[in-house]
């Protein structure tokens, strides 16, 4: 089943120039893509190529300058109030900048309960039980529930944001460099959790990343973005080989897992 369909999406930002006239900076240009239930897809690209802007459009935080985004066959622009509430529950995003994604005055307990209060019909006791369950799933415990964001490390706060997104059991989870920024042990744990969600609920995942190793370990399909366009799409096999210049640049930038020892006869 197709969850998300994007057709001819373009987006620009207006900013003032020295002459006082508004100038337009193109960020996305004619982007089209589809995401299916239970699918794991990577959006791969260097910083500044338009990945995060695309993600903000997909979750409805901004409206595109041109093109259409459909969720389960319905255009986002035409959703009624009830449909929009269901959409906000069904698609969740974990931002790269976790500090800006939470209210620093609220406790972790309040942060985790917030989407459940607005998007689910759960009693308070059920919300608290699920909050504890989600914390455990991301390798945190109840000791952080009464803490506020400034009292947490960056990695802890990022996992709190992931737990918050998972609490409403979304049908699509968008992760903007979220897993890439965790250490390898936590990465493996989160990936196991996401696989479990896929099996249990058919949750689809869109990884926005520049981490090629993550793509190879977990994703079924990869899209390469460069200068606001998707320049390549392919299935992920045993050995990824890119045809686009942008894909090859990212692949060549990957360091070996272990240092390569030089021979004594090699010149440095």
Swiss-Prot record:
It catalyses: Ni(2+)(out) + ATP + H2O = Ni(2+)(in) + ADP + phosphate + H(+). GO terms for cellular component: plasma membrane. Pfam families: ABC_tran (PF00005). SUPFAM superfamilies: P-loop containing nucleoside triphosphate hydrolases. Its EC number is 7.2.2.11. Keywords: ATP-binding, Cell inner membrane, Cell membrane, Ion transport, Membrane, Nickel, Nickel transport, Nucleotide-binding, Translocase, Transport. InterPro entries: AAA+_ATPase, ABC_transp_ATP-bind, ABC_transporter-like_ATP-bd, ABC_transporter-like_CS, Nickel_NikE, P-loop_NTPase. Residues 4-252 form the ABC transporter domain. It is a peripheral membrane protein. It is an enzyme of class 7 (translocase). It is found in: Cell inner membrane. ATP binds at residues 45-52. GO terms for molecular function: ABC-type nickel transporter activity; ATP binding; ATP hydrolysis activity; nickel cation binding. Part of the ABC transporter complex NikABCDE involved in nickel import. Responsible for energy coupling to the transport system. Belongs to the ABC transporter superfamily. Nickel importer (TC 3.A.1.5.3) family. The complex is composed of two ATP-binding proteins (NikD and NikE), two transmembrane proteins (NikB and NikC) and a solute-binding protein (NikA). PANTHER family: D,D-DIPEPTIDE TRANSPORT ATP-BINDING PROTEIN DDPF-RELATED, TRANSPORT ATP-BINDING PROTEIN. This is Nickel import ATP-binding protein NikE. The gene is nikE.
């Amino acid at each position: 089943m197709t969850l998300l369909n994007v057709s001819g999406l373009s987006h620009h930002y207006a900013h003032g120039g020295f002459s006082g006239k508004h100038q337009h900076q193109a960020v996305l240009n004619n982007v089209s893509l589809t995401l299916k239930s239970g699918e794991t897809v990577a959006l791969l690209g260097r910083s500044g190529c338009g990945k995060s802007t695309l993600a903000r459009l997909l979750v409805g935080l901004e409206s595109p300058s041109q093109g259409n985004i459909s969720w389960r066959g319905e255009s986002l622009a035409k959703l009624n109030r009830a449909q929009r509430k269901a959409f906000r529950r069904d698609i969740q995003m974990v931002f790269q900048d976790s500090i800006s994604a939470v209210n620093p005055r609220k406790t972790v307990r309040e942060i985790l309960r917030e989407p459940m209060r607005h998007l689910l019909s759960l009693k308070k006791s059920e919300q608290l039980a699920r909050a504890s369950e989600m914390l455990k799933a991301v390798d945190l415990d109840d000791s952080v529930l009464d803490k506020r964001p400034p009292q947490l490390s960056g990695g802890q706060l990022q996992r709190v944001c992931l737990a918050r997104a998972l609490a409403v059991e979304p049908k699509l989870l968008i992760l903007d460099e979220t897993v890439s920024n965790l250490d390898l042990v936590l990465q493996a744990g989160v990936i196991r959790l996401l696989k479990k969600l896929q099996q249990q609920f058919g949750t689809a995942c869109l990884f926005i990343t520049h981490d090629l190793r993550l793509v190879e370990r977990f994703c079924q399909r990869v899209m390469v973005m460069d200068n606001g366009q998707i320049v390549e799409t392919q299935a992920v096999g045993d050995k990824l080989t890119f045809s686009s210049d942008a894909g090859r640049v990212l692949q060549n930038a990957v360091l070996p897992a272990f240092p390569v020892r030089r021979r004594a006869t090699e010149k440095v």
